[in-house]
Amino acid sequence: MAKEELIEFGGVVSEALPDNRYRVTLENGVEIWAYASGKMQKHRIRILAGDRVTLEMSPYDLTKGRINFRHKS
């Protein structure tokens, strides 16, 4: 899939789950499942509940996403 096809959203992490997965509430109120991107895992960037994040979602499955940026608090 080309990167141009990804949809970017902002949201807040509501819960940290096992296996580097998170439950994120988007700005429009929808709750989805998300995981940290490979670079975030490689550099061991910690994501906690309450963090503001930017994530990418495929237009084909709007229930899952990939967190690609954690905003500074």
From Swiss-Prot:
Subcellular location field: Cytoplasm
Alphabetized InterPro entries for the sequence: NA-bd_OB-fold (IPR012340), RNA-binding_domain_S1_IF1 (IPR006196), TIF_IF1 (IPR004368)
Function: One of the essential components for the initiation of protein synthesis. Stabilizes the binding of IF-2 and IF-3 on the 30S subunit to which N-formylmethionyl-tRNA(fMet) subsequently binds. Helps modulate mRNA selection, yielding the 30S pre-initiation complex (PIC). Upon addition of the 50S ribosomal subunit IF-1, IF-2 and IF-3 are released leaving the mature 70S translation initiation complex.
Organism whose genome encodes this protein: Cupriavidus necator (strain ATCC 17699 / DSM 428 / KCTC 22496 / NCIMB 10442 / H16 / Stanier 337) (Ralstonia eutropha)
Protein name as annotated: Translation initiation factor IF-1 1
Keywords noted in UniProt: Cytoplasm, Initiation factor, Protein biosynthesis, RNA-binding, rRNA-binding
Keyword Cytoplasm annotated: yes
Annotated Gene Ontology cellular component terms: cytosol
GO molecular-function terms, A-Z: ribosome binding; rRNA binding; translation initiation factor activity
Pfam families per UniProt: eIF-1a
Assembly, per entry: Component of the 30S ribosomal translation pre-initiation complex which assembles on the 30S ribosome in the order IF-2 and IF-3, IF-1 and N-formylmethionyl-tRNA(fMet); mRNA recruitment can occur at any time during PIC assembly.
Domain of life: Bacteria
PANTHER family: TRANSLATION INITIATION FACTOR IF-1, CHLOROPLASTIC
